């Protein structure tokens, strides 16, 4: 996905924004040529299976999927697991979709990409992956972001902010999502790269995993504070909820007064946390557009259009 890179000041804190390009935002995509006219001739049924619907980011993705269905004149059902660790629940949804033979295409954001690749190996159902790529020749296209690039951008900005905040020794610790998840691991790699390039040090051995849940991020932050009573310059997190949770956990400790807390997402809760002085900055991604373009890609494939491998 081509990205527009924007920067904006929010209550004195830098909010890095990497929004989906692909010819424009979802509002612009709605007017994308002949696609809608072609689609209204068919009553396509698209099943969308997301990682979860429990978090604000995934609700944005789901809303984009539904809007694409309305604009393109197709039926879209959006499903999601109860959490980002409910692996069996999502696999069951995918298996049911594959065996039910009641839809024309499937859009999926996999929790376990390798397992899903095996699961879809023998299907003829058109499949589009979103958010997290699936290494399978059954997947027609991937709609998403380069998570390493996003995190690297946040890492670089965090180091610059830490310098301005007066930190001499700039070290960073990550509170990340699900251990082994490709998105989480890519973001760790990106944060590490961006921080190093800007002159900081990412403490890889001290990475905490909190399953993308704010409450678990609080527990992770408490462990970091216990291990580093002197303070840490930067805390990077897999999403905004976790970054804000970590900041709340550290609020009572003077050594963490100037710590830079960085998340990824840019949802309303994240922006509110920045304005409230909790989270310092976020790398904002347009989940709505990811969902919209995922459904649009599925419809284009059903209409015989050859898709780009990476949208």
Named regions from a protein language model:
Residues 17-21:
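C-terminal motif of bacterial Sec signal peptides marking the signal peptidase cleavage site
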